[in-house]
């Protein structure tokens, strides 16, 4: 709500230097001391394509994103989910035929959203699968987690996750 009343109850639990990706972010764990809930944020150097990608994701996808830009620093909220490469290797083989059909439909939607936003390089390690448990089934949503490859290429295949060999099992 914008109020600063909760700030005294927030602690920085840990700060990790992450060696993955091209941004090499710091991962900061913030914990609420009243209820022990925590959240992760990534602090990285801001650049125009990353901010552009985050803005488009926030406006054009069904997922809201929390991020803050101050001068040349970008703070992004962690996007929870199962990394795509882990999901393909460990979870996809165990899915039922109905679940696989639903995952394929979700991947088609994800593929089109990436194309519309010119979000490239959506290899399996650049998106997460979010399982949503319903009464009698699990629904799988796909969310991008890397937003820095915006509008660089003239080849449209770059913006279609279906064309990356890592994603063939999802297709």
PLM feature spans:
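Charged, amphipathic alpha-helical linkers/stalks
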Residues: 159-171
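Conserved ATP-binding subdomain of kinase catalytic cores across diverse folds
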Residues: 1-86
